[in-house]
């Protein structure tokens, strides 16, 4: 929970995920040139932060000392992922759209890569930067996120993954 600057894990450390949940899967297009598959998940998630966290925020209590809790009220979240594989493409195109009606929650897409590397790349205002995958011991932010403008990427000897996005300026390895 939190906002675009500060993220706080809820006290129950509950992660709500599509992993292991039933999905609607349909083949939207299939021809000699490409195949498009659509995967849809409907999940019930807390509608926002709980009353205690709201009170702490209104009292301007230091965010790093706040105790986070979630609302008991649930709202539906729709997650649609479209997989496109084209005959001449060098990789699989993945487009995920999330209809998020919940407030004050972080929503992320996770891409397990199986890559073995200690570095990754991301764009910044005027360059592509190389960063270590793990922060050093002096890193005090409870969130391990990094900033980017349009993409983050990593690779090893066997392959790689580039995630390009619009409107989301953070990522975590």
Regions found by a protein language model. Name each.
Residues 1-173:
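C-terminal (or distal) subdomains of carbohydrate-active enzymes
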């Amino acid at each position: 929970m939190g906002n675009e600057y500060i993220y706080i894990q809820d006290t129950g450390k509950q992660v709500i995920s599509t992993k292991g949940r039933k999905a609607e899967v349909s083949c939207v297009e299939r021809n000699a040139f490409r195949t498009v598959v659509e995967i849809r998940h409907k999940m019930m998630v807390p509608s926002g932060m709980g009353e205690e966290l709201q009170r702490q925020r209104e009292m301007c209590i230091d965010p790093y000392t706040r105790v986070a809790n979630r609302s008991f009220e649930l709202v539906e979240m729709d997650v649609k992922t479209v997989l496109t594989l084209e005959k001449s493409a060098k990789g699989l195109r993945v487009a995920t759209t999330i209809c998020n009606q919940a407030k004050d929650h972080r929503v992320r897409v996770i891409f397990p890569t199986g890559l073995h590397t200690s570095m990754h790349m991301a764009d910044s205002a005027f360059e592509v930067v190389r960063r270590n995958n793990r922060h050093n011991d002096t890193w005090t932010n409870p969130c391990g996120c990094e900033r980017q403008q349009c993409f983050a990427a990593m690779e090893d000897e066997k392959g790689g993954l580039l995630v390009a996005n619009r409107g989301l300026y953070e990522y975590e390895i």
